[in-house]
Structures are given as structure tokens and as C-alpha cells.
């Protein structure tokens, strides 16, 4: 059976489970697998860029809706200046000691689902964010994504292990978990190899949402 679309993935999971009573919850298994995959996989195909302009006097920067993890944040107006991540305590300390001064942002921290910048931008500031993005979730209106096309085994075994609560002491669950772990490890390793092999990597460019 081909495994290149959401419909084909659901059919394959149903075949592996061989349980007619679980058909309705298979989409939930896939959703749970995607949540776990977003935690487990760091692949160059998940890298994306988002560029924009931060308004003067606004210390809080919006994060893209599909953001998982920051690789690098830098300013792009005149040359390139990296904005470094610091802890919330360090941010609070800087603002307390320097009375929330304004200037060119040099640091950021995570605050309430946003990036808090320091110093607060004194002028409109252009930036570019390089980050790890979430998978495009599969659904009836989104038949595939790069992971399903490249590594359908990750999706298949990831979904199957989330059927465990319905299968009691089924020995297959442990096998599926091993297969999932091995597939994830190979995918992450292949990504690291590609990064250092001179392969041409192309990033997706997203606007802030």
C-alpha cells in the first residue's frame, strides 16, 4: 500500500491495528503522533525564516504561529547584529538596573508567548528570525507534508504507539515504539549529516502571524 497521503496513512494504521472499533480515533492517533514528532525531530526541512520590522518603543515581538524553537534572531537594518537569548531573571535585572532604557536590541527572552527585547527599540528595527517550525498537520484538507513523503514510517509507528491505551497488553506496542525511535534517530542523523556535507539547503520564508 502506498503511504503518501493522509487517507492512505489512516488506512495503513487501520490495517496494522486490525480493529474496526478504532477507526474513529485514528485521526487522534495521528494528531498525538504529530505532537510527539514536533518534540523529537529536529530536521533541516523544519527550518524557516521570518522577517519583519519591530516598531519603536515596543519591547515585545510577536512569534510566528508555527514557531517551535529559535535558531537565531538578528537585526538586519544596517549590517547584521545577533540578538542573544538570556533568562527572564537576567532580563528583569537589566531592566531594573538600567530603568528600561531604549536603544538597539541586544538581548531577548521568552515572555507570555512573545520575545521581550532589551533595550526597547529606540526606532523601527528590521529583523530576521531563523527558527524550527512545527509540522504542517495532516488533515482532510492537507493531504501530505514533507515528513509523510520522506519518512512515512515515522508517522505510521508514531501513530500506532498512541493506540496503546486501547490495546491492553499487546506486545506489538513495544515493537512499534522501537521502530519509531529508530526511524526518528535515523532521520535526525541524516539531517545532521546533510548540514555538514555541503548540501544546498533551502529555507521556507514565512511572515509573522
What kind of region is each of these model predictions?
Residues 1-209:
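Glycine-enriched, solvent-exposed interface loops adjoining structured elements
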Amino acid at each position: 500500500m502506498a503511504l503518501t497521503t493522509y487517507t492512505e496513512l489512516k488506512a495503513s494504521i487501520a490495517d496494522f491495528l486490525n480493529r474496526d472499533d478504532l477507526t474513529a480515533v485514528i485521526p487522534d492517533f495521528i494528531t498525538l503522533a504529530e505532537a510527539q514528532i514536533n518534540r523529537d525531530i529536529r530536521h533541516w526541512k523544519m527550518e524557516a525564516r521570518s522577517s519583519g520590522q519591530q516598531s519603536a518603543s515596543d519591547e515585545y515581538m510577536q512569534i510566528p504561529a508555527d514557531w517551535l524553537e529559535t535558531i537565531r534572531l538578528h537585526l538586519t537594518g544596517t549590517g547584521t547584529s545577533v540578538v542573544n537569548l538570556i533568562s527572564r531573571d537576567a532580563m528583569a535585572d537589566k531592566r531594573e538596573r538600567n530603568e528600561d532604557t531604549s536603544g538597539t536590541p541586544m538581548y531577548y527572552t521568552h515572555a507570555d508567548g512573545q520575545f521581550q527585547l532589551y533595550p526597547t527599540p529606540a526606532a523601527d528595527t528590521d529583523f530576521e528570525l531563523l527558527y524550527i517550525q512545527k509540522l504542517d498537520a495532516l488533515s482532510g484538507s492537507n493531504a501530505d507534508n514533507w515528513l509523510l513523503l520522506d519518512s512515512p514510517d515515522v508517522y505510521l509507528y508514531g501513530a500506532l504507539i498512541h493506540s496503546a491505551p486501547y490495546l491492553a497488553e499487546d506486545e506489538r506496542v513495544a515493537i512499534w515504539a522501537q521502530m519509531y525511535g529508530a526511524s526518528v534517530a535515523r532521520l535526525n542523523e541524516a539531517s545532521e549529516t546533510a548540514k555538514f556535507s555541503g548540501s544546498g539547503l533551502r529555507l521556507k520564508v514565512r511572515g509573522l502571524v
